[in-house]
Every structure is written in structure tokens, then in C-alpha cells.
């Protein structure tokens, strides 16, 4: 029978390990974890950024907005539904909705529980999304330091998972990109000295699929 199951969606169960490759996959225990979740595409985009910022600057609070392309859970034309916004035509509207990504981050970083929240805006784009992260941090910082911390991580512990670009690109340029998050360094901003904004692009299908493969390979090697 099946010995290991990797779920490609969030699971709201504290007994199930929320595993984001490159961030906390070292927590996997072959004798304990037979079912794990790879969280979601957006969680995989946010988690590496949270790791870098929290490890180096300590996050006090944060708000996350994902500007997300449409998915097959939406409708082409308006239709009756209990979810009034998701029932509207997906290709002609910007649609505010919920995201479980911030909640999943809290499972990965319990010390941030109640300190991060967010929502999604579904936009009429076929593929590639953008996550906007705003953090209040304990340590004073600057735009240059934030970008340097992210760049350093992208070359070391988070190589091939987190990337940084200085190019003036748009969403379609990240179609079929294998990284979980590609930070747009030109959009990084710091206000005051401890309020920062980081924007990261991601292919919510292909990037996430690559991490699923990374997880499967890791489980195979360990098991």
C-alpha cells in the first residue's frame, strides 16, 4: 500500500507537518510523518522571505497581499454562490478573497502566530502572481540591507528556491520559472527604519510543482 502521502494543499491539522522545502524540510521524520502537506504556492513564495527577514531582523508584525492569477475554482461568468465575490466573472474583475498562506506561515513559525495576516486579490491573468509583504521588524534596517540579505540567502541556503532580480519585468516574464519566489529588488522599500515592503513574483503552478518534486526526492532519500 501507500507508505507516504504528500498533499499539494494546506491541511488545517496540527498533527500534519506543513513542509516548505528549503525552510523547514529538516523537520521531516520518516518514522513519524507519513502524511505531509507542501502547503500552497503562495506559502512557498512567502516562507523563504519570512525566513530571511525573521532570522536576521525579527518580525514584529506583518501583512501579506497576494495578487494572484485566476484558478479553476473561479467562474468565467457571474453565477449564484454563497461566496459573493468568488461568484463573479474571473476574467473581467479584480476579486478580493481569502488566502490561507499567512495562517500556514504561523504553523511553520509558531512564534509569529497572531502577528501575520493577509488576503488575496484574484486578477484576470492566466499565470504568474505577485506577493506583496509588509513587515514591521525589531531591528533598524534599510532597503539596501534587506535586498542584500535576500540576495545572500538566494546564493546559499535558499539557492534555486529564492531568487532576486533587478530587472524591470512583468508577470508573464515569470511564466515557467522554477523558483518559489523571485524578489523584485527595485520594489523593495523601507519606511522609517523598521517598516519594510518586499514584492516577490512566482509561477504559482510551475514553481510549486518543482518544490513538490524536491520534497518527494527528499522523502525518498531519507525513507
Feature names for model-found ranges:
Residues 1-87, 190, 212-214, 222:
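N-terminal Rossmann-like NAD(P) cofactor-binding subdomain of oxidoreductases
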Residues 50, 147-150, 216:
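A generic alpha-helix structural signal
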Residues 58-61, 66-196:
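C-terminal substrate-binding/catalytic lobe of Rossmann-fold NAD(P)-dependent oxidoreductases
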Amino acid at each position: 500500500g501507500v507508505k507516504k502521502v504528500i498533499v499539494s494543499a494546506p491541511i488545517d491539522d496540527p498533527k500534519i507537518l506543513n513542509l516548505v522545502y528549503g525552510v523547514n524540510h529538516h523537520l521531516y521524520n520518516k518514522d513519524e510523518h507519513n502524511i505531509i502537506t507542501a502547503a500552497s504556492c503562495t506559502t512557498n513564495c512567502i516562507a523563504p522571505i519570512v525566513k530571511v527577514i525573521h532570522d536576521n531582523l525579527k518580525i514584529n508584525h506583518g501583512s501579506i497581499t497576494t495578487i494572484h492569477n485566476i484558478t479553476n475554482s473561479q467562474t468565467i461568468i457571474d453565477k449564484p454562490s454563497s461566496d459573493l465575490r468568488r461568484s463573479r466573472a474571473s476574467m473581467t474583475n479584480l476579486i478580493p478573497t481569502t488566502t490561507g498562506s499567512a495562517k500556514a506561515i504561523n504553523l511553520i513559525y509558531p512564534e509569529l502566530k497572531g502577528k501575520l495576516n493577509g488576503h488575496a486579490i484574484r486578477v484576470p491573468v492566466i499565470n504568474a502572481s505577485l506577493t506583496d509583504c509588509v513587515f514591521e521588524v525589531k531591528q533598524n534596517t534599510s532597503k539596501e540591507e534587506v535586498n542584500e540579505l535576500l540576495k545572500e540567502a538566494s546564493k546559499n541556503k535558499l539557492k534555486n528556491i529564492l531568487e532576486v532580480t533587478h530587472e524591470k519585468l512583468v508577470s508573464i516574464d515569470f511564466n515557467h520559472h522554477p523558483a518559489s519566489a523571485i524578489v523584485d529588488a527595485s520594489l523593495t522599500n523601507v519606511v522609517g527604519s523598521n517598516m519594510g515592503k518586499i514584492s516577490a513574483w512566482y509561477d504559482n503552478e510551475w514553481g510549486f510543482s518543482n518544490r513538490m518534486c524536491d520534497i518527494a526526492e527528499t522523502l525518498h532519500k531519507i525513507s
